[in-house]
């Protein structure tokens, strides 16, 4: 009868077009949960009475099942709260639409991973490890590919980076290794079972990479209130701008013309801002080193593909070339000395040498392994080796082992000189043919963080470079002003012996001291006469002295008079200071003539010192 009354009430509500309230829904759900809980308790009590309860399945199966059950419960609670929000207000419908869009995007991403980036579905796609590596690389290029300014990331890009990286890295939650362990049941029985735990390399390196990721995002987020701004290179700076004067001096970014130019106030950065920038640069440098260490470790643990070994030449000489091979096989070998002799003017040349050295390492290793394989082969078909042949093979193996060690040392020193060297051909082939998904995740994630950290360091270096130019331009503007130049040109302000030429002549304290550079480095043409002064007294001294002097005296005078010719635009030579200098030069000429007459029988040009 009660059920009939309830059904009639429901029919009346439907007729009156009334929807059930939220309280009714909650009471009905509570009643259902209480009835289901009571039935579950009754069934569990009967099972407990019959036999001793086994441990829960999450305890037996190990870490992933436990984590998955936790995720399931958390997702159910989130979905329930989300449904409650959608029933209360209209803003929940927008959130529901965004959630569905995220789900569709996640489906698309995982579909590409499963298909191996082959949308035809014909099975011609890449392996899963390479697909995940490409997904992380493409996501990094999308978010950080245009990191041209030191400014915080937009909220959309930051949310997209974290959300999609969480999707991709969720694969690593199910990469486990089985370890033997003992399980104790409540009745006291012990059983040896295999439990799951996360793989050791992922358990150690993946949380570290996530921490480095958050630190880099925090560094970018700290550039909110800054003392600098950016201007595109295509925009002409105004004349009133204090930093427009040194804009054309920035040659650091000529190769990368698309980068905006950092601009500063006329006084440059303050000491506090510059100290903070240096601190952030140091933090980014440490993050870069940590990411590079994880990346190199992941690449080292990858197997060398057979396709790379098949393309190697037969001997090490053809890999290294005659010059490097001669140095490596010599008795006295030094990697630093060899690198000093080589042309390492660009990173392209350094990368080519690194590829050659790396190829020679695996060529010599393969030769050693093949020789050892011949010695260890004891089949009846192969001829028996004599003791002399065995000794020759062992000596050849020792020699190739020494060459492998030298090549590894050379490669290590080369990478230390070029820490930002790009990946070698061996690294590229390892990434392409790798099958291990965990190593692929570590390698691609660390490489993405390497790129982000190096970009931040480069932008900070550009900013510090512009700050140095700003402060130098202020000093140059002070020296090049008309008032200062008129003061410098005045003859009573700056004496002649202490004046420095603007053409870059080496500095000297006075004319009575030894020159700052050796006269033997200068080789003027024979018979050349230089008349730097226009006064008659100077011409008479030169005409009398030059024809009868030797080669060494001419070099000394050219050294001094050459500098005086450059300084004549600043000082009037008719002054008393000029006459004193000319008299001093004439005395030096007479002394040199006397010395030249006493040293006629010397071989080669004599060496002179001016007193």
Curated annotation (Swiss-Prot):
Compositional bias segments (type: Basic and acidic residues): 525-541
GO molecular function, one term: guanyl-nucleotide exchange factor activity
Source domain of life: Eukaryota
Coiled-coil intervals, chain numbering: none
Annotated region (Disordered), positions in chain: 1-62, 513-541, 588-611
Domain PRONE residues, every copy: 93-477
Pfam families in the record: PRONE (PF03759)
Biased segments, Low complexity type: 34-51
InterPro entries linked: PRONE_dom, RopGEF
Keywords: Guanine-nucleotide releasing factor
UniProt comment concerning the protein's domains: The PRONE (plant-specific Rop nucleotide exchanger) domain is responsible for the GEF activity.
Job of this protein: Guanine-nucleotide exchange factor (GEF) that acts as an activator of Rop (Rho of plants) GTPases by promoting the exchange of GDP for GTP.
Name of the featured protein: Rop guanine nucleotide exchange factor 5
